[in-house]
Regions:
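Positively charged, low-complexity terminal tracts
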Residues: 1-84
Length: 84
């Protein structure tokens, strides 16, 4: 299944709803909707690391914020488990 990452915009904050533009597969939209923090972070990381995907400055801002959310709400609590 191909995903058009450029057609996805991430939530600008934890309190806002995800914004999906253009046509993407419904199941991807469902994942983002149901598992907002984790899915947004994972998709953002994939997109952020993929030099083939072209995004505009607004989308880059959404990506940076989603990566930050992923780190704050998912990665940080996991890392805390390994701290002395």
């Amino acid at each position: 299944m191909k995903i058009n990452f450029a057609a996805i915009k991430f939530r600008p904050s934890l309190s806002s709803e995800p914004v999906v533009i253009e046509d993407i597969h419904k199941q991807i939209a469902d994942v983002i909707w149901q598992r907002k923090e984790v899915a947004a972070g994972k998709f953002a990381l994939k997109l952020y690391d993929n030099p083939e995907v072209e995004v505009d400055e607004t989308e880059k801002g959404y990506i940076r914020e989603a990566v930050g959310e992923f780190r704050q709400w998912v990665a940080a609590p996991i890392l805390e488990l390994f701290e002395d």
